[in-house]
A protein has these predicted regions:
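Phosphate/ribose-recognition catalytic cores of enzymes acting on nucleotide-derived substrates
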Residues: 1-18, 47, 65-66, 75-78, ...
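Charged, low-complexity surface patches
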Residues: 13, 87, 97
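Active-site scaffold of zinc-dependent metalloenzymes
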Residues: 52-90, 100-114
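Short alpha-helical functional segments enriched in proximate histidine and acidic residues
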Residues: 23, 27, 92, 96-100
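Auxiliary, metal-adjacent structural segments of Zn-dependent hydrolase domains
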Residues: 16, 21-69, 83
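A generic secondary-structure micro-motif detector
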Residues: 10, 83-84, 94
Length: 114
């Protein structure tokens, strides 16, 4: 995977994100459908995903829509096999959805989603 061109990496991760969303259990799938999920080709060392916005139920109707960014090149570089990449994309997506649902890092770690 690391030898692929950057746009191929982004396309691959976009497909994996779509597959992950389709197979999420409720209520995670419904939460994912409320979010703008973007796959970015920027190489961000040590950062696979980022949640930006106000967590669900925290109020502030004036806030921008909640967004998750998945960093395709960082994931592809660190997880070169398809199986490892598929697993990590799903794990990253679930982790960031957890932030949207109001979970902090210790909550996520307690659920095995660090």
């Amino acid at each position: 995977m690391t030898d692929d061109a950057p746009d191929e990496q982004v396309a691959q991760v976009e497909r994996l994100v779509g597959e992950a969303i389709r197979t999420l259990p409720e209520p995670l799938r419904s939460a994912a459908e409320e979010l703008l999920i973007v796959v970015d080709g920027t190489r961000r060392t040590g950062l696979y995903g980022l949640f930006e916005g106000v967590p669900r139920g925290a109020g502030d109707a004036e806030a921008l829509p909640p967004r998750i960014t998945i960093y395709a090149r960082a994931l592809a570089a660190d997880f070169p096999s398809r199986a490892a990449l598929t697993s990590e994309v799903r794990k990253t997506l679930v982790h960031e959805i957890g932030h949207y649902l109001g979970l902090d890092e210790s909550d996520l770690a307690g659920r095995g989603l660090e």
